[in-house]
Amino acid sequence: FEDLDSATVTLGVGKNMVQSIRYWMRAAQLIDPIDNHPTDLGTLLFDMDSGEDPFLEDQGTLWLLHWLLASNTEMATAISWFFSKYHKASFDQGELRAALSSYLQESMIKKRPAAATLKSDISVLARLYAKTQMAIVAEDVLDSPLSELGLIFEHGKSGYSSTFQDHSDLPSEIVGF
């Protein structure tokens, strides 16, 4: 990820997507924010030769990534806020934007993000955690692996729900992390 051009070829995506992938890997503490090399955790999980879950197949890895994002108030503010401060069971993206904006206005010392940034952040939150509800999922529609955790559910075109429930697939090792 040091060289944008070679990363686009290696990953087969555009420069904007490479930058997005880099951002989320930093937010999940998988790469170092200074040199973009894998952190110890990134190597432990995803190293192709010795990693515990190089293909992101273990449910425990998804839970760990969720926790790392949800506890990162600086780089994943909307995710952290949603899972620690927002407790409404049913909502739409507009309600989330308004609630997040209000929270940021009350709690942030620095400048509040623009409305377009809030809209984008809430859209990312929904795409990360809610499965696409389509009768037939198109080839070009890929859900985020985090949607497998069942933390946010899509209802209709813009409605969502999130309720507290037992998650028997949450490994005790992740709780102890």
Regions found by a protein language model. Name each.
Residues 1-177:
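Donor-sugar nucleotide-binding helix/loop cap in glycosyltransferases
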